[in-house]
Swiss-Prot record:
It comes from Bos taurus (Bovine). The gene is GTF2E1. Residues 354-364, 379-388 have a biased composition (Acidic residues). This is General transcription factor IIE subunit 1. It is found in: Nucleus. Belongs to the TFIIE alpha subunit family. It holds the Pfam family Zn_Ribbon_TF. Keywords: Acetylation, Metal-binding, Nucleus, Phosphoprotein, Transcription, Transcription regulation, Zinc, Zinc-finger. The keyword Transcription regulation applies.
Length: 438
């Protein structure tokens, strides 16, 4: 059962007290903001903006001043919208118990300040030296009086002192406290009337409530927007009924018509002439090393050779190069031993293997073409021979050919080499080492 002395409604005296104080000591903006909080227990900041038509920065400045003076309190609540987005809102309300205590404190502070000013004005110095600016009170007049001249002189510089007009008590200094009590009497009466008022907790800490005026205006706006939407068709949106929702801001409808794009692309291609294919795409660069006469002498049909080359150029571009290398490697073992032995000193003397390889390839070009045409079906065997030659190169020892692996296993063969053969052997080992790590 509730206590009969606890009030569940704010007394009219407390409301009048709040109005008197806010209108007597604050501006019109503060008075308007507090009037809304007097009529409505707890108001959201957005609703106050809607009612007062203030700028948000201006309203917050006013509310912060009132909150700093303990006239109002603020409560922040996190709310979840229909779309799942959480927002924070500030709710303001008046705690009347704190309001009464603040008013009592400020009035008492003002009364003490007036009494202090009145007391200081009666005890201030009344004489001042124009030279050294020393001040003296009425109680020091016996020290200032000079009986020889009958004047008041400064005790420091012996200059005649003057009355300090700025230190003279004001005419209304003694009546200021009386005037203050007379003007603040209505507030004192309201404070005495609300001295023993005990308010319930739901009045001191109210819950947020909806303002009827705003609710009616929103309902009317929603009804008008719905009627306008029906009159204008379904394509018109009722903006007032849609809250701060962001789900429709990024909705985009994109339609892609591929037929139109293909027609435009085809038309653009028809207007442009086809670019000429480069020579390395139209024909093999290796084929240029052979001429038609050499191919005829070797018994090769030029047309069939070209058809064969064109048929193999697409699937594998490296096939022609590999075939030429295989033919070259096959030709090397069939060469006379004398020619091979003569080639080694020349290679060592020139210090370059690329020149000897180039000369051999130039000398063997016609037989190579014939071999290509005659041995299309023996490529596997040639691959095996190429691997054997590549894996085990030939080294000359005293004019006789030996495999590189055999010379490496028998050091006595190295001792039988001539200086030129030894240099060729060392160079071949270096090349094999470099090829191994490339």
């Amino acid at each position: 059962m509730a206590d009969p002395d606890v009030l569940t409604e704010v007394p009219a005296a407390l409301k009048r007290l709040a109005k008197y104080v806010i209108r007597g000591f604050y501006g019109i903006e503060h008075a308007l903001a507090l009037d809304i909080l007097i009529r409505n227990p707890c108001v959201k900041e957005e609703d106050m903006l809607e009612l007062l038509k203030f700028d948000r920065k201006q309203l917050r400045s006013v509310l912060n001043n009132l909150k700093g003076d303990k006239f109002i309190k603020c409560r922040m609540r996190v709310e979840t919208a229909a779309d799942g987005k959480t927002t924070r809102h500030n709710y303001y309300f008046i705690n009347y118990r704190t309001l009464v205590n603040v008013v009592k404190y400020k009035l008492d502070h003002m009364r003490r300040r007036i009494e202090t000013d009145e007391r200081d004005s009666t005890n201030r110095a009344s004489f001042k030296c124009p030279v050294c600016s020393s001040t003296f009170t009425d109680l020091e007049a016996n020290q200032l009086f000079d009986p020889m001249t009958g004047t008041f002189r400064c005790t420091f510089c012996q200059t005649e002192v003057e009355e300090d007009e700025s230190a003279m008590p004001k005419k209304d200094a003694r009546t200021l406290l009386a005037r203050f009590n007379e003007q603040i009497e209505p507030i004192y009466a309201l404070l005495r009337e609300t001295e023993d008022v005990n308010l319930a907790y739901e009045i001191l800490e109210p819950e947020p409530t909806e303002i009827p005026a705003l609710k009616q205006s929103k309902d009317r706006a929603a009804t008008a927007a719905g009627a306008a939407g029906l009159a204008g068709g379904h394509h018109r949106e009722a903006w007032t009924t849609k809250g701060p929702s962001y789900e429709d801001l990024y909705t985009q409808n994109v339609v892609i018509n591929m037929d139109d794009q293909e027609d435009l692309h085809r038309a653009s291609l028809e207007g442009k002439s086809a670019k000429e294919r480069p020579i390395w795409l139209r024909e093999s660069t290796v084929q240029g090393a052979y001429n038609s006469e050499e191919m005829k002498e070797g018994g090769i049909d030029i047309d069939s050779f070209q058809e064969h080359e064109e048929g193999h150029a697409g699937p594998d571009d490296n096939e022609e190069v590999m075939r030429a290398l295989l033919i070259h490697e096959k030709k090397t073992p069939s060469a006379p031993a004398g020619s091979v032995g003569a080639a080694a000193p020349v290679t060592a003397a020139n210090g370059s293997d690329s020149e000897s390889e180039t000369s051999e390839s130039d000398d063997d070009s016609p037989p190579r073409v014939a071999t290509v045409a005659a041995h299309h079906g023996e490529e596997d065997e040639e691959d095996d021979e190429f691997e054997e030659v590549a894996d085990d190169p030939v080294v000359m020892v005293a004019g006789r050919p030996f495999s590189y692996s055999e010379v490496s296993q028998k050091p006595e063969l190295v001792a039988q080499m001539t200086p030129e053969e030894k240099e060729a052997y060392i160079a071949m080992g270096q090349r094999m080492f470099e090829d191994l790590f490339e």
